[in-house]
Structures are given as C-alpha cells and as structure tokens.
C-alpha cells in the first residue's frame, strides 16, 4: 500500500517548497532588508508561490538575488564580496552536491531559529556524505550575512577616502577572520559524518543511536569550543536548541525509518555458491498479521522457490514445470 507521503506527493511537495522559500525570504527581509522595495511580505509571498512550482534550486537562486540586491542597497563593496562568495559557493555546490538544495536553504533558516544542530543530524540520516558541501555552503552564508548585519553601520557609512577598501576588508573579515564559523563548520561536518556512519551500521535502533550521539557531540563540542574561544552567554541557547533539534530528529526517524524491532526475523538460506544470513526488520506501519516471511532451508524448498520465480518471470503456470 502506498504511503501517504507518496500518495499525496503532488500536493505535499509544493507546500513544502512554498513554506521553506517563504521562511527564507521573510528571514532575509527581517535581518538584511536594506532595499525596502523588495523587502515586503507581499513580495515574499509572491516569490514563494513562484518557488513552489520551480525546482528547489529556483528558491536558492531567487534568494541569492534578493541578498545581492540588499547588499547593493547597503554598499556596492559588500555586494561585490557577496557576489564572489556566491560564485564560489555555486561552484562548490554544483560540483559536489547538486541534489541537496534544501541543505543550502534550511541551514541558514535553522540558524535563524536557533536550532542549527538539527541540520547535520538530519542530513546524516537522510543524505549521503557529499551532502556536507551544501551544509558548508549554508553555514558560510549564515555567518557572512550575520556579520554584515552586525557591522551594517560601518559597511553602510558615507563614502570617504579609503572607505571602499575598508568596507571590503570588513566584509571579508566576516569570513576569513571568523573563528566561531570555523568552529561550527568543524563540529557540524564531523557530526554529519558520525551520524551517517552510525545509521549505516547493522545494529538495532541505529538511527536513534546516531541521533543521540550526534546531538551530544554537537552540544558538548559547541560549549567546549565557545569556552576555548572566550565566547560567553550561549550555553543555554545551545542546550535548548539541542533538545529541540533532538525532538525534530526523532520526528524525522518516525517519518522515514520507523521499524518494529520486536518482530525482527533472522533468516538463513543458501544457493549453489553461498550461505545467506539475513536480518529482516519489519516497518512499524505493517501489522503483524500482514507480515509474510519466506524462509529458505533445504534443497527442496530452494528448488520450489526457483521454480516459482521462473514461472512468475515467464508468466506461466508453475504446475507446468513439474
């Protein structure tokens, strides 16, 4: 039976695209909406509606254009730095992680909502290792925009002698001199790798173990890293964000990998060349009475199964092969 997600995908996907795009555009307007003409809620709604019928990459592109226009309204020099950053990010993104657009969009959004820890855990659960490149792009983008916001007075000052050079230096320093960004990059990339490795292991409750280890590593790493860097006042935010991220991660597990380990079957069968040892864990949405397990043991059953498969493939009656 087709699951609800597959059955209503034609409706669910546009809604998800619209919601993600609208959230991204509203956060852009709220934090760096320096160009007032494009920084209104109606404009954000219209653009989000357009993004709902476009590939996810369309939202990434439109968001990039909005950011560049806002940067231009603040300062031409900052806009140039942002443009160079976007070019480098697009090269990295399209080269290594072209199918992980949601990572680029959702990472800055989660930072804005103070739940960034869910991103490396969620991507480690649902994606492959190369998705770390989209995660990196999202982290770099967030810290750049956050740095611009914190220094908007300096960057948007009246042009004076050597002011242009000074603005470029300040803008670049949001990336090159940001030790907190490097800390977050290291911890989140390692977290993604840890979660990915654990959830691939052949152990019971692999996803739950991966979530717990990932969240704990992030929380401890961020608190310890902030202490080393002399950053104070973030411990409570980190702990609360970690708890919320953990809850969201378990919701992801329920939606995408909900297994019933109490009904685990261990099967053994063989063919002419190999012995097979199989561990079968049914999905929790399948009722116990509906479960059908075929066991292979002995040459007679193997012959019968081979005959049955052949009959099915040839679309003939199995009795004709007796």
Segments from the language model and where they lie:
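Short, small-residue-biased leader/transition segments that mark boundaries at the very start
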Residues: 2-4
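Generic multipass alpha-helical transmembrane bundles of integral membrane proteins
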Residues: 110-111, 119-233, 238-242
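Short, highly charged, low-complexity non-transmembrane loops/tails of multi-pass membrane proteins
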Residues: 259-309
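Alpha-helical transmembrane segments of multi-pass integral membrane proteins
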Residues: 9-14, 23-26, 226-279
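Hydrophobic transmembrane alpha-helices
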Residues: 10-64, 70-71
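Structural signature of hydrophobic alpha-helical transmembrane segments
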Residues: 35-40, 70-84, 178-186
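Membrane-interface helix-loop-helix junctions at boundaries between adjacent transmembrane segments
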Residues: 49, 62-136
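Alpha-helical membrane-inserting segments
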Residues: 24-32, 50, 122, 126, ...
């Amino acid at each position: 039976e087709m699951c609800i997600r597959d059955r209503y995908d034609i409706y669910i996907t546009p809604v998800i695209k619209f919601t993600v795009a609208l959230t991204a555009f509203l956060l852009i307007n709220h934090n760096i909406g320096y160009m007032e003409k494009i920084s209104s809620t109606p404009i954000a709604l219209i653009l989000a509606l357009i993004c709902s019928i476009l590939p996810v990459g369309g939202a990434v592109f439109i968001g990039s254009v909005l950011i560049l226009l806002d940067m231009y309204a603040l300062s031409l020099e900052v806009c140039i730095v942002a443009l160079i950053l976007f070019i480098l990010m697009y090269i990295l993104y399209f080269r290594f992680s072209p199918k992980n657009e949601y990572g680029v969009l959702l990472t800055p959004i989660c930072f804005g909502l103070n739940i960034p820890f869910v991103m490396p855990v969620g991507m480690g659960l649902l994606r492959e290792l190369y998705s770390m490149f989209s995660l990196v792009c999202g982290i770099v983008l967030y810290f750049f925009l956050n740095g611009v916001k914190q220094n908007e007075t300096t960057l948007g000052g009246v042009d004076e002698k050597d002011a242009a050079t000074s603005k470029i230096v300040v803008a670049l320093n949001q990336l090159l001199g940001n030790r907190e960004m490097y800390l977050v990059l290291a911890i989140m990339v390692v977290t993604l790798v840890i979660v990915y490795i654990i959830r691939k292991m052949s152990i019971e409750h692999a996803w739950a173990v991966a979530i717990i280890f990932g969240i704990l590593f992030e929380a401890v790493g961020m608190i310890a890293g902030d202490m080393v860097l002399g950053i104070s006042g973030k411990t409570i935010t980190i702990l609360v964000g970690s708890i919320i991220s953990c809850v969201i991660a378990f919701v992801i597990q329920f939606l995408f990998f909900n297994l019933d380990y109490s009904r685990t079957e261990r099967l053994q069968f063989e063919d002419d060349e190999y012995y097979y040892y199989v561990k079968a864990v049914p999905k929790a949405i399948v009722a116990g009475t509906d479960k059908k397990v075929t066991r292979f043991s002995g040459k007679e059953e193997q012959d019968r199964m081979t005959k049955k498969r052949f009959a099915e493939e040839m679309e003939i009656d199995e009795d004709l092969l007796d």
